[in-house]
């Protein structure tokens, strides 16, 4: 590359640095607590899951988010060792497994922390261990387990065709009448329910209506009827 080419490259590199910097330092105004249905995750992935999935919704992640504009990502970069997680490991493997590769749970938790959790701010999210403890508290203690919420509404993972409103209304019953966000994936001739997201305020003190939903025409849009779960 000649000098002229290098001169033209400088603004591009600078712009990229600014973009990354802004993305990692911006604030957020709510949290998404996203849980994924294991069989649907395996069915929608190009590479088969290494182990049979459980018929459960387990944690995908807890994500600081914005109702308008981009969400913050990669605010810090820190590798977490398995020994640091210590006695939390047994609980995390149950509620937050790496569904695609169960030999790499710690790698999955690292990716979720670095991309999303690291952008949380104290006192809501103080550090990586507090992030993991917060997720355990939400899923187990505060009963934000989507599988249990659906089960209380008599919606079980039986491979039946469901109505979107029935699923949404069931989640509303468990979240003080706040609207969740659904993600579906078309698989051959059926549309499977892949994820359900519960939203909370930026302090994780109360549920809110999820601001964003997949629009009609999106590959992740859930139809009014004919959702497999």
From Swiss-Prot:
Domain of life, per UniProt, equals Eukaryota
Which residues get glycosylated? 77, 87, 145, 188, 203
Biological process terms in GO annotation? RNA catabolic process
- Kindly state one GO CC term assigned in the UniProt record: extracellular region
Give disulfide pairs as residue numbers: 42-49, 75-119, 184-222, 199-210
Q: What does this protein do?
A: Self-incompatibility (SI) is the inherited ability of a flowering plant to prevent self-fertilization by discriminating between self and non-self pollen during pollination. In many species, self-incompatibility is controlled by the single, multiallelic locus S.
A UniProt-annotated Pfam family: Ribonuclease_T2
Matches recorded under Gene3D superfamilies: Ribonuclease T2-like
Query: Where does the signal peptide begin and end?
Result: 1-27
Enzyme Commission code(s) on record:
4.6.1.19
Q: Which residues form the active site?
A: 60, 112, 116
The protein's name is Ribonuclease S-6
Per the UniProt record, the lineage of the source organism begins with: Eukaryota, Viridiplantae, Streptophyta, Embryophyta, Tracheophyta
Q: Hey, which family's this protein in?
A: Belongs to the RNase T2 family.
Residues that hold RNA according to the record: 36, 60, 98-99, 108, 111-112, 115-116
